[in-house]
Amino acid sequence: MAEDNSWKTSNFRQSVVNKINEAIQQTGMTSSKNGIEMENHVFHKARNKDEYLGFVARLILHVREMTAAAQQAQQDGGGNSSQQGGGGGGGGSGMPDPINALQNLASQGTRPQMMGQMGVGPGGPMGGQMGGAGQASNLLHSLRPQMQMGGMGGPMQGNRVGMGPGNQMGGMMGGPNQMQGPGAGMVGGMPGQMGVGMGPGGMSGGKIQMGVGPGGPNQMNPMVMGQIQAQLQNQNAMGGQQMGTVGGTMNAGNQMGQMVGANAGMNPQAMGMASNQVVRQQQLQQQGMGQVQMGLGPGQMGQLSAGVQGGVGHGGPAMQQQQQAGGMGPGAGPNQMNPGVAMGPGGVVGPAGGGGVMGPGPNQMLGAGGAGGPGAGQQGNFVGMGANAMVRKPPEMMPGGNVYPGSGGAVRSVTPNNFLRQSPSPSVPSPVGPGAHGPPSHPGQMIPSPALIPSPNPHMGGVAQRSTIGQSPGGSLNTPGQPGGAVPSPLNPQDEQLYREKYRALTKYIEPLKRMIAKMENDDIDKIAKMKRLLEILSNPSVRIPLETLHKCEAALTSQLGSIRETPTNNPLVEAVSSSLQAATGNHTLQRTFRPCLEALFGPDIKNLPPPAKQSRLALDDTGAAVGTGGGEIPHILQGEIARLDQKFKVSLDQCAISGTRTIKLICWLDDKNLPCVPPVAVTIPEDYPSTAPSCSLIEQEYNATPFLILVQKSLMARICKLPGLFTLSHLLDTWEMSVRQACSPNPTIVAPTGTSVLLGM
């Protein structure tokens, strides 16, 4: 399969930058680097899309963990750390485990069809793994809207939570009956012990079941409490989105009372349903259903407010699913307005297709978003999932999909940006309409109500009022918000107009800033980094920054670049010309561009000029080329002959010649790279040349200097004697060259020249 390079596109990278900036704003962390620099570092470090998304998830986890410790210390007072060891290893402080989260990301990126498998190995703490991997998986899905689960045999599409075609949440791909193995079911069925069993059969095929034994809802052992508390603490730590900590903090001495709210006057009907719910859970476990069931009553489910509530039912006729927008059961208190997020295959929990907590009677049901019999194909509660739907799938996947009991496992479907506020009135819109059928047309339809209304429920007094409804998962809103606060209203029109005018005024600095960065390429690195940061702010209008920051940018740019006037109208032309001149074809481009304009202005070049007078041509090296002896011109015949001479002969006028005569004296040199250098010869051209042959004379002092030159002189004299009566300058110079060649031969005197040999140049 071809490698997916969509993560390298500018639009995809910009969405990642927006999410990083959003996480920084929500946590209130101050960083020396902005989102663009962080994303650029991650982009160059990653080799493929999975690594890229994994690094981004780790980065955002790190940003959120920076403030998680301080917030958790304030909320819990340090009393919850002793309850964190229940998941087979304990999370200590409930902090997310980024290593498991990133391993989970890698497996999710390569096998989206197996994202619903819930194989948790022994020793995996429910709180730490669920919190860290939940955030990371939510981040991954928010970055990958295209992985928003495919079809499930009909209209059940928009809410598939990492499910393969086999409609399983815990097994490999295949039918729902593949959930087999020695660990199936609630092992031992021990009272009060957290069991995570995978049923070998049933129509829901191996979903996680987390049941509480018949010890009573207020007597959960520390293991269960630690795991639930770890979930809640992780939720509290995510950007200040505090939810699910019903009644404030949870202590070992009051483990279940504050969570359920029983110590604060919980209605007896919900309390009575809690124990019945536990019995029902054990029945479901023995049947191998394996659905996600937290051992809490419906009232507790409502108070958990979109925590890890995967309520499912058997789907019998007694399961009267109620299509209520707020999800209130008939016997539940006002604290049950928000339904648990049902995490079934495709959002359909159990064969009945509803997404609530379904007990054996109608009074034990928390309202789900849809009703119908088996195979109804309805959408479950699509609570803020959109592109952020996730299913925890740790890397310790057991063969056959078995989950070891006691290790802890959780399904988490609420992203940090999509926490639901508890609503006191049904008039506040639900995340989805009641009984929504068919896949949602757009994730934007699933934005929960932005109403920030405090709940009148006394049991929710400990829940911090900063839990908010985040932005749409796929949205790239860039409005700055305070950490953990509600989405602020947009700026008033006056401030918006001031911001736009100031930004437009600063755009004139973009080009000078680019040129300055190019000039300072090898200079001060810190200064270049500041300049690049300013350029990023000016070049990215989608990122909103405070108006004070714009004023600071303007002051810095003014100090660096000075006051820049408005761009002149001809500036683009000048820049285009300067860039064209730097190219190799600059002159050609200029001529092709401006010649028609110049011809139109000044007319074409003057044509049909009179032919210039024929000038005398003589290949002479000095200024006396056209100077004839006695003031006359050099004959044209002689000029033509000199012009046609071989390039190895260099001819010039003799400057020492006596003026007043009509004869022409020339000095000739032989310049051949294959012959030795010899002194020049003096040639006298008579007045009636070519009727009279020229004469040649050698400078005796020079040609008598060495035996070689003496041999050249003798050979030349012998050859001249063999020349015919009328010969030309060309004949004379060729004879001179042959004399030099003969002197250079090993046996220069063996062959005497003859008239024929001399004429033939031999």
UniProtKB/Swiss-Prot annotation:
Gene Ontology cellular-component terms listed: core mediator complex
GO molecular function: transcription coregulator activity
Bias (Gly residues) ranges: 76-94
Record localization: Nucleus
Region (Disordered): 70-102, 311-330, 406-494
Main location: nucleus
UniProt keywords, alphabetically: Activator, Nucleus, Transcription, Transcription regulation
Pfam families: Med15_C, Med15_M, Med15_N
Record-level GO BP terms: regulation of DNA-templated transcription
Transmembrane spans: none
Subunit structure: Component of the Mediator complex.
Function: Component of the Mediator complex, a coactivator involved in the regulated transcription of nearly all RNA polymerase II-dependent genes. Mediator functions as a bridge to convey information from gene-specific regulatory proteins to the basal RNA polymerase II transcription machinery. Mediator is recruited to promoters by direct interactions with regulatory proteins and serves as a scaffold for the assembly of a functional preinitiation complex with RNA polymerase II and the general transcription factors.
Family: Belongs to the Mediator complex subunit 15 family.
Name recorded for this polypeptide: Mediator of RNA polymerase II transcription subunit 15
Organism this protein belongs to: Anopheles gambiae (African malaria mosquito)
